[in-house]
């Protein structure tokens, strides 16, 4: 039986080690003199220097084409897709397989968060094409977070996908996974998980898809009541999870995020209560006192930035609501329109509250698009 396997990684290096000819010579020698001579060793796996289409040389002189021409057919080749963190698609596999002349071994950089360590990904596993088979890829490796227990929700999805690719359903799998990981506090865990999915930058994920938020100027009482109920669930979820979670390792990993999640629920509820006072417009002093009470202090923001959730809808609702009410209140008091700076641009996250970091008077914070600029991109104020 093949009980041992080895992999060589030529990713993220420079110098002579990037030479694909020397790489294949080494790999072929190891295959001949070690793997095949031993007999009980699994096929080698290699991560090429050109592991992503983002920078891979597409020509016949590129390393992938050299792999295809000279690398022992038994050796499996890692591939991350069109970019470092990307979906598994027939198109990206066609591109790489035609060069390496074998089905690629897909290295899926999810749920890894080494580029956003202040986020813990608990959303559904999607972005994996369900029409693929062994002619398209030889396997899939999921790169987990540094949080082993919290990674299990995503790994449950990847395992389910590999078990039956054609029948895989991301939402059905996610719903089952929540119950498997936290059966005694499933609903509270679901409340946290559905609002802890997106990365804000890089490999974007859908989040809070069951929650409708709005601007204060578009107030609708029915929607406001529904949003208050959701923030109430958010506020209560940490205590319910702590009470029902029997996995101490998972609880330990989630706790810093749950603490901030509960605070997010509290300030969301207060924002809606404050909005009613604001809309009533009868007691300016009461409004302003409650407004000041609901502002996040510097410490509050530091704590939230360190362990973020609700980044796509919940926290933006709070930020926008507080800004809209302050703007409207000052306009009402002074009779003049205040000057308000806002970030604009072609980047998707320029439209989010991340752009406020341009104007927070803190030299240690900044806005970043999170992606490389290309022709036609712009950012402005």
Show the residue positions of the predicted features:
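C-terminal functional modules
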Residues: 167-338
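Short, conserved phosphate-binding/catalytic loop or strand-edge motifs used
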Residues: 6-13
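Disordered, acidic Ser/Thr/Pro-rich linker "stalks" and the adjacent N-terminal cap
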Residues: 331-381
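Short, Φ-rich (hydrophobic/aromatic) sequence segments
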Residues: 153-164, 266-269, 377-381
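Catalytic-core regions of glycoside hydrolase
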Residues: 13-175
């Amino acid at each position: 039986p093949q009980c041992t396997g080895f992999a060589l990684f030529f990713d993220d290096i420079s110098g002579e080690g990037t030479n694909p000819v020397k790489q294949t010579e080494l790999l072929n020698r190891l295959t001949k003199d070690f793997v095949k001579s031993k007999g009980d060793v699994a096929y080698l796996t290699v991560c090429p220097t050109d592991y992503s289409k983002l920078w891979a040389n597409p020509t016949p002189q590129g390393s992938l084409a050299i792999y295809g021409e000279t690398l022992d057919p038994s050796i499996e080749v890692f591939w991350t897709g069109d970019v470092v963190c990307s979906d598994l698609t027939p198109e990206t596999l066609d591109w790489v397989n035609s060069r390496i002349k074998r089905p690629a071994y897909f290295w899926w950089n999810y749920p890894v968060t080494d580029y956003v360590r202040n986020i813990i990904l608990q959303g559904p596993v999607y972005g994996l094409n369900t029409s693929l088979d062994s002619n398209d890829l030889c396997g899939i490796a999921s790169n987990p977070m540094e949080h082993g227990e919290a990674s299990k929700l995503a790994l449950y999805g990847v395992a389910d996908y590999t078990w039956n690719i054609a029948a895989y359903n991301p939402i059905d799998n996610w719903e089952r996974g929540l119950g498997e990981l936290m059966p005694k506090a499933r609903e509270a865990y679901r409340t946290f998980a559905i609002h802890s999915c997106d990365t804000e930058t890089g490999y974007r994920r859908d989040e809070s898809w069951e929650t409708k938020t709005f601007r204060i100027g578009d107030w609708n009482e029915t929607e406001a009541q529904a949003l208050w109920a959701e923030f109430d669930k958010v506020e209560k979820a940490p205590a319910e999870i702590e009470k029902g979670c029997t996995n101490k390792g998972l609880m330990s990993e989630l706790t810093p995020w749950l603490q901030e999640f509960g605070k997010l629920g509290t300030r969301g509820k207060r924002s809606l209560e404050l909005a009613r006072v604001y809309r009533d417009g009868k007691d300016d002093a009461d409004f302003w006192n409650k407004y000041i009470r609901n502002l996040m202090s510097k410490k509050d923001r530091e704590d939230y930035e360190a362990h973020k959730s609700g980044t796509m809808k919940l926290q933006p609702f709070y930020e926008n609501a507080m800004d809209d009410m302050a703007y409207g209140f000052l306009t009402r008091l002074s009779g003049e329109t205040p000057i308000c700076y806002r970030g604009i641009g072609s980047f998707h996250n320029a439209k989010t509250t991340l752009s406020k970091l341009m104007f927070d008077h803190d030299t240690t914070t900044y806005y970043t698009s999170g992606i490389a600029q290309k022709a036609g991109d712009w950012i402005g104020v």
